[in-house]
Amino acid sequence: MLQLQSLDAFESWLKADTPKPAAVQALDLRKYKTKLRDHKFHGSIFLSCKLCRDSSHAIIKGGGVIIPDSPSLSFPAHRDKLYGVDELFAGYKGGLIKDYQNCYDYLIYREFMRHGKLDTPLDVGMFRYLHDHSITDALYELIRGRKVVAIMGGHGMERADPFYTKIARLSRKLTKAGFLMVSGGGPGAMEATHLGAYFAGRPEAEMSEAIARIGVRPERRLKSKKGEYADQDWLARAWAIRADYPRSKDDKQNYPSIGIPTWFYGHEPPSPFPTHIAKYFSNSIREDEAFQINADFFGRFLG
């Protein structure tokens, strides 16, 4: 089946007298209501596309299937690409962790908890699986042909831990060598993975400075049994590093990394350092995809 993810590709496809079956993904097609008339769309699916009433009628009349977004849910049924940090953290301004609760990512998490992690209404469960399927599709498009190193676990590792620095240095070195770094997208060892990739275009001394800054915890929290990610300023410290060491467009393109977190563990904010975030509702699907991405090397940390 063809996958159409741009209006140029859609227009070329539409010029055929009988378009081949295609998945039309997350496109705004409201201006095409006239061109959609009298076409046959048997076998084609329109996923999360913006359509006017006339366009929808023409597609259904032509034998196509429309899967729209749910107006009662905050997330789309289908995405044609992975999330970015700016998208998930929209609404967060760099303050304490309570301020993170105003962002888009946490809005979805609250909705996730309200509907239930597992025993959900049928429509909600269906839309979650559709969303996760599109994340997997976008993930595989991104890693295709790449040399991948994946690191999972280790969410309890503190930023001041020597292993955090070692992982960041290794990740930076591998990223510069052309490997695509992938992690579970959470705190600890996973965050170190993305921090290393984040600084691949900068001198290592700057990364060392950043780690020294990001690892300073509030003194009252040092004896806490909860992980460092429970610190009220955990995210703010990382956000300050992003602000003080911004990445250029070329760095983002040349040194990408992918976080694969889940709303199932949504109490842990995702790391703000990867260029791409493949966030899932289903933890089992997320774990399965993390193990099946054919990584050249796979590392897992305890804790």
Regions found by a protein language model. Name each.
Residues M1-G125:
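Long, compositionally biased, glycine/small-hydrophobic-enriched stretches that function as flexible linkers
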Residues F10-K33, R37-D38, H42, L47-K50, ...:
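Acidic/glycine-enriched connector segments
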Residues L36-R37, T136-R144, K249:
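Short boundary motifs at domain starts and secondary-structure transition points
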Residues L47, V149-G154, M181-S183:
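Short glycine-rich or small-residue beta-strand-to-loop segments that form or flank ligand, phosphate
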Residues L51-R53, G156-E158, V182-E191:
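Gly/Ser/Thr-rich loops at beta-strand to alpha-helix junctions
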Residues Y129-L142, R286-D288:
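Short, charged beta->alpha transition segments
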Residues R144, V148-M157, L174:
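Active-site donor-nucleotide binding/catalytic segment of nucleotide-sugar enzymes
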Residues D161-P162, R172-A177:
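Glycine-rich phosphate/diphosphate-binding loop of Rossmann-like nucleotide-binding domains
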